Amino acid sequence: MGKSRQNSTTTVDREKDEIQKAMGHEKAEFEALEVARHGGREIDDLIDDMERQLDEAGGLNKGFFQVQFANPKHFTWLLVAFASMGGLLSGLDQSLISGANLFLPDDLGLTEHENSLVNSGMPLGAVGGALLLSPANEYFGRKGAIIISIILYTIGAALEAGSINFGMIVSSRVILGLGVGLEGGTVPVYVAETVERRIRGNLVSLYQFNIALGEVLGYAVGAIFLNVPGNWRYILGSSLLFSTIMFFGMLFLPESPRFLIHQKRHLDAYKVWKRIRGIEDRESREEFYVMSASVVSEENAVAEGAKNHRFPWMDFFTEPRARRALVYANIMILLGQLTGVNAIMYYMSVLMNQIGFDKKESNYMSLVGGGSLLLGTIPAIFLMERFGRRFWAITMLPGFFIGLVLIGVSYQFDVETQLQTVEGLYLSGLIIYMGFFGSYACLTWVVPSEVYPTYLRSYGMTTSDALLFLASFIVTYNFTAMQNAMGKTGLALGFYGGIAFIGEIYQIFFMPETKNKTLEEIDVVFSRPTMDIVRENWAGVKETTHLLLTGHWHKVFVEQAMTDPKDQVQVSHA
């Protein structure tokens, strides 16, 4: 009995030590959270000191590009609108190739293998763009990295439109992909680091909405230029308009305040915070205090050698808190990509042609898939923080499976003799699959942008972004070969559907909840041992199952949605 108690005590001590080790000098962060909860005087002292420094420096920066609103919340919406336009560019450039696919191969004399490389060139380039994410974010900041990505978008689109051979079109697609990869990993972090926690998940989800909107616009552009000579050139070059608008819009936006503190530019961070969040609201003052304490404690830990100062990447292997975030975020991304969504998006017009539509009809019918994805993102934008991350992950994956089953079954009927059955089943499955994926896709940007510690966030997003586009490249490049090897039903139902089924089991057990938490509180969540999270999730599953079986639907859905957004993770100092 004594030995058992001793082992139990040792386990508790080991877990405490693990938390302290994983978070380095996070005692300062814990204390900052407690000060914020109890309204300590330290918060006002910090704000007063920053105001004094601001007065000595001559006040807030003035100038043509220094936009300021009477109500800081209006600045938040401006910031999110322009930053998230990167999602629109990304989605637009992903779907434009679908319409161009009907004409480009014949005009340039491409083989089937060469056309696969053209389609997969952008996700391949995006892997390279993701690898640029860390150095670009560390040396140029979040804002600078976004501007660089826009320049790459512009160069790539211009070269695409003017391509005269296979080498030129592939090169332009890779350059375009560099912009997609760099921007895709930067914008969600930029938004997550600048907006208030209660709407963070909703506004990061807006990025996915813009991706879906861009994909719909891409299909619409394909339809507009369908009967124009040289149509695919106009289709691929149309994104130049949006990249130009976004470039000028980004010039008016500030740098991320968390990044500025990370760079030891505390006064600049305070200036930005005052412009975009204000200091009149108590919650905003508390969040600035906690953010400052958290980032400073991380930087001190690095400086004192508690972490791998020269090789920050190593913390993903040596620090349990960072490792948990890396494993979870990247498995979640893989589960989405390996269900084939990007292959379906890129080959949408070709797939429509395979089930009986002519080229013109195929282009128009592509709007069905893109429109379903767009509509599917809307609930997540408004309800991400209300229902939480686990709800969206666990309820969306079964929708993938059902949609893929219908798509797979549709291939079992003869297009020549049962055309209506084939098209009915296929389109129904496509609508269900894309609709459910719209909400899940929001998580692939929300979760990676919030789970990594500040000093590793750009490195973490590099791995997540690179993995996302690497999986997209693999799925897209091998789509035709896999379809020929497995059969259309085997690929849709067996492979893609099987991934969705496995993913559901993983999310049920291993996905922690991070809704309504500051980025600093999420540090605490991922400092807990994985088995603690699994036990907590399993207890929640049993309770939810019991409530559903006994007819208490109100407690499962309504009460969860009414959770007080001010609820925060409690930190024990025992």
Curated annotation (Swiss-Prot):
One of its GO terms (cellular component) is plasma membrane. Induction: Expressed during growth on endosperm tissue. Repressed in conditions of high nitrogen. It is found in: Cell membrane. One of its GO terms (molecular function) is myo-inositol transmembrane transporter activity. The chain crosses the membrane at residues 77-97, 116-136, 144-164, 174-194, 206-226, 234-254, 331-351, 364-384, 391-411, 427-447, 466-486, 491-511. It catalyses: myo-inositol(out) + H(+)(out) = myo-inositol(in) + H(+)(in). Its main location: membrane. It comes from the Eukaryota. GO terms for biological process: myo-inositol import across plasma membrane. It is a multi-pass membrane protein. Residues 1-76, 137-143, 195-205, 255-330, 385-390, 448-465, 512-574 are cytoplasmic. Changing residue 277 to G/K: Abolishes production of the polyketide mycotoxin fumonisin B1 (FB1), severely decreases macroconidia production. InterPro entries: MFS_dom, MFS_sugar_transport-like, MFS_trans_sf, Myo-inositol_Transporter, Sugar/inositol_transpt, Sugar_transporter_CS. Residues 98-115, 165-173, 227-233, 352-363, 412-426, 487-490 are extracellular. Belongs to the major facilitator superfamily. Sugar transporter (TC 2.A.1.1) family. PANTHER family: MAJOR FACILITATOR SUPERFAMILY (MFS) PROFILE DOMAIN-CONTAINING PROTEIN, PROTON MYO-INOSITOL COTRANSPORTER. NCBIfam families: SP. Transporter for myo-inositol. Also appears to transport the polyketide mycotoxin fumonisin B1 (FB1). Does not appear to transport hexose sugars. This is Myo-inositol transporter FST1. It comes from Gibberella moniliformis (strain M3125 / FGSC 7600).
